[in-house]
């Protein structure tokens, strides 16, 4: 049992060192963390009202958002549109909700429609 614990701790230390090295090389933390063991769990619990959800969708459904949170936001939008279709009819990044990008650094690939956003 002691030997197993030592193996586990060594592997975690090495993974953490590799993670820090990747970060030092400029790899975004949210991407570098994929080499960490599944034991380094990330949990997300949020409470939002409709206004906060609209803001979240505007930011996190943009193609410039990190892919993993974009996938979570897309599923949240699907469920929100099921429960409150009128409220969330135009939710999403500004390229969908307003017809043009409001980002300081646009991605150059705006969504053409809500359907395209939800199907991606």
Feature annotation, model-predicted:
Residues 1-120:
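A conserved ligand/cofactor-binding region detector
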